[in-house]
Amino acid sequence: MPDPREIIEAKQLVVEGKDTGAFFEAFMDDMGVTGIQIQNFGGVRELSVFLKALCIMPGFKAQVTSLGIVRDAETNPVAAFRSVCGALNGVGLPTPAQPLVPVGQSPRVCVLILPDAATPGMLETVLLRAVADDPAMECVDRYFRCVGQQTGSLPANMPKAQIQAFLASRPRPGLLTGYAARAGYLGLDSPAYDDVRQFLQALQGPTGLPA
């Protein structure tokens, strides 16, 4: 498990893995959002331990006004949300009634489940929605149909494989998610990211996002 970093911002965003953190950093830069510090809690089984460590960091109780947590739904979005709430409850933090609905004060807590509160999947599922109308996606679909027909099997994690195949079609192939977002390859203005925008607005509090 990664250790929490020194708290330097009142608004803390806790994400699952470095790739998700890099994407959110790029997304916030694109939106002009500042004042949010990203923390990486590692894997899903490490969230409870990470939150315990974060809550005893110097400055957490006195400084932190907002706490956002991002987790993949994986196979069950309801179970994923309950798991996050269990981790929050375990350290005495407010537990939201549902994703995207903030609760409490100092810290105000909000949870985002990806791709959404009702669908299995992950960050890459959201990315695929954002680029669904790109002409290259037809090629990606044909590629995996061919792979399945020729080999009799497909990658275990299809969303990750599909987004990597899509990014291989870009002028600068092979970029990781955060770099791909900064390069303009992931359609950051897409409605597919509406939940992400709503989540960041909740994390920002009454001031909201920049105009």
Question: Which residues does each predicted region cover?
Answer:
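Short N-terminal binding/cap micro-motifs at the start of the first secondary-structure element
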Residues: T20-F24
